[in-house]
């Protein structure tokens, strides 16, 4: 079988970049290289003063947030290495996944810096790093991830339709639920603080993480689109039922986390509004995957509308050009190259 006849999830380890089968994945890699940032660019000095202004409820929220961030990106990085890189059989896609792994490492470094800055007490830091074990609302989210993602870890090859379906569920959980729902929920709390003029350093770093995570999610959805074209028989009623159930579970797990963060409610942020927001996001993910929405909720947070549209596309353009790594030149994708 020639390289041009292989499908994206066919077993093997394709190494040949010429001719390119999936040039769009390569372009995503190039775009990611242009948007390089470092933790050292994030100034957290003003955040220290802001932390002293927060109420006990708000301080509790921040502690839970940074604990989740550190835990969540570690789960993401492990899945990249153990599952996605192994089974997405495209050198172009693996270039992007290599870049994504670097970005996830930067995110972990950012969250490590947040923990060291926001939690001066060493015991508080240790508890945050061990959040999966000692914070029930974060443990519930981790258990959700393991339920939907771990079944692929021991698969060496995607030989059967059932194997490939399991991989798709892993990928969709990774993109739509972890990066596309859990992190989007956490970002909403960050931008709620920013809308009140607080924690600008956290918001700045989150801007760049938001950008990265959105690109990661978009790449994963393009992988799903490609598999749908190559193997449409995988996308049957059963898969739709499984994905819909997965998103429903993700909303409930994230809402439990929201109850932990918000308690009885804070001015402008409560569990009712967060449920509406999460349901809106879940519907968006289902529609992007080609499935029917189930909630019909609208986004209640105006500060997230701004973030999702204007800032997501423009904030890199506003950064000093010295921080943006340009990639010059073009690549000819002609198969006769």
Residue ranges, per PLM feature:
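Non-heme di-metal
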Residues: 1-337
